[in-house]
Amino acid sequence: MARKLYPIGIQTFERIRKEDKFYVDKTEYIYRMTHTDGTYFFLSRPRRFGKSLLVSTFQSYFEGKKELFEGLAIEKLEKEWTAYPVLHFDLSKGKHMEKEQLNRYLLDIIEKQEARFDCKSNKIDVNIRLDDLINAVCRKTGRQVVVLIDEYDAPLLDVAHEKEKLDDLRNTMRNFYSPLKGNESMLRFVFMTGITKFSQLSIFSELNNIKNVSMKLPYAGICGITKEELLTQMSDDIDELAENLEQSREETIEELKSHYDGYHFCWPSPDVFNPYSLLNCFADGEIDSYWFGTGTPTYLINMMRKYDFLPADLGETIEVGKKDFDAPTETMTTIVPLLYQSGYVTIKGYDKPTKLYQLALPNQEIRVGLYGSLLPHYLTDKSAKANTTIAKMSVLVKKGDMDAAFCLLNDFLETVPYCDNTNYEGHWQQTLYIMFALLTNYSILVEPHTAKGRIDITMETADAIYVMELKFNKSAEEALAQIEARHYADAFKMSGKKVVKIGLNFSVKDEVNCLEWKIG
């Protein structure tokens, strides 16, 4: 079988089909949404999750390009293939702009649509210009108009927490969107995508009938790649990757799941893989970090500081009601909506009696990428050496040589300059938490948890489970005694693996960082 051509970086459905590149069939969702009640639809998904390709697929469908859908699910579902005029607005380039720049940008993208339909206008107000365009296209073609808006929130993301700038840009965008309400009779379908959810009142003040399908089960798999799609549409890709990695098909599927799976956008929900990472993985023939490398989480780190959200908090399950994470980011009072809507945490469960959702990191790619990005903020110029230390520690941990592993860690800690920080203990608690969490990059299962003045950690390798208690300014003996007294290791008696108990203590002696340990 000829090797698939993967559409890395290609977001145009027509090009993918004409160039015979691989396409995960999402057309059943297209048919479902276009044949249900409602005219206005909104979908929120993290970046690099296939939103732009979905919008492009809608465009080809509404333009009646039946030949592009040959062999896809919708070919058997759709009987009419009526062609409609489509206005496609991509707002992804409308970032980092002042009010005047944004206004010019909106006029420019309207002009491009005017040129497509040979409609001339010299109006300078974006709302009047768009209103005229919808009316002119409807009259000219004799059909209702389809409006597709990709990344509706792009102009607002940078200023979501700068009230004065946000108000200015939000008013501009509200003005731009206002004709969508007044021309309802001329519109066949309106679809908008974005990353974050801005309050409906602030952006679409008059558009009160948008159907938000972001957390609806019928559309849970509309973006991303579900496990079923992976196993049925990419089966040969799995086999080829397994051959490259010199491991079994089953081992490869498990590795793909641990690295790229784990997303859920409602509950219950199918397992959803990150499409960008999965396609890059198959194209390269190796499992690596892809999605995280496409965006710098500086903004996220700043927000973590603002809301006093620690790295250790990311490792815990967050229990919240729907309104506390599926909420407008510009009015958020915690960091949870930003974490969820950006794809750093996802739904992992739901408790029906309390109506509380469990949110957590989706997979290893996010865990390692996020903690790897946080490490330089705690170790500054020592982060590269820390990564080397973690890599070398992983080899020793897998061998079961814990004395050597902790000697290596202690040698590194001694090189980090002492800083008379008012929260020195808290700083190092988070630093060590991150370093242990990053061992997951080397096939070591790490579950660290924090409490006041200590960290408890379990590490699992192929043949052993290590139960560790890390204290600060106490003693390793005291840490080990706590493991014994509280029977922490009992939970792993039936694992069939050797269970090793380790007490750790971090302290500062003569302004030098020191780690001591005792293995029970």
Task: Give a label for each model feature.
Residues 167-171, 472-489:
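Mg2+/Mn2+-dependent nuclease catalytic core
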